[in-house]
Amino acid sequence: YTATRDNCCILDERFGSYCPTTCG
């Protein structure tokens, strides 16, 4: 899953939902 400016938060099966600092 690649984070984008429109969708920063990621829903991962193992790690759960999180927002990478590399967003934007």
Curated annotation (Swiss-Prot):
The UniProt keywords, alphabetically, are: Blood coagulation, Coiled coil, Disulfide bond, Hemostasis, Secreted
Keyword Coiled coil carried by entry: yes
PTM summary from the entry reads:
Conversion of fibrinogen to fibrin is triggered by thrombin, which cleaves fibrinopeptides A and B from alpha and beta chains, and thus exposes the N-terminal polymerization sites responsible for the formation of the soft clot. The soft clot is converted into the hard clot by factor XIIIA which catalyzes the epsilon-(gamma-glutamyl)lysine cross-linking between gamma chains (stronger) and between alpha chains (weaker) of different monomers.
Q: Name one GO biological process term.
A: protein polymerization
Query: Record's Pfam families?
Result: Fib_alpha (PF08702)
Which terms does the record give in the GO molecular function aspect?
A: signaling receptor binding
GO cellular component terms attached to this protein's record: fibrinogen complex
Where is it located? Secreted
Q: What is its main location?
A: secreted
Subunit and partners: Heterohexamer; disulfide linked. Contains 2 sets of 3 non-identical chains (alpha, beta and gamma). The 2 heterotrimers are in head to head conformation with the N-termini in a small central domain.
What is the annotated role of this protein in its UniProt record?
Answer: Together with fibrinogen alpha (FGA) and fibrinogen beta (FGB), polymerizes to form an insoluble fibrin matrix. Has a major function in hemostasis as one of the primary components of blood clots. In addition, functions during the early stages of wound repair to stabilize the lesion and guide cell migration during re-epithelialization. Was originally thought to be essential for platelet aggregation, based on in vitro studies using anticoagulated blood. However, subsequent studies have shown that it is not absolutely required for thrombus formation in vivo.
Q: What does the UniProt entry state concerning the protein's domains?
A: A long coiled coil structure formed by 3 polypeptide chains connects the central nodule to the C-terminal domains (distal nodules). The long C-terminal ends of the alpha chains fold back, contributing a fourth strand to the coiled coil structure.
The protein, known as: Fibrinogen gamma chain
Taxonomy of origin reads: Eukaryota, Metazoa, Chordata, Craniata, Vertebrata
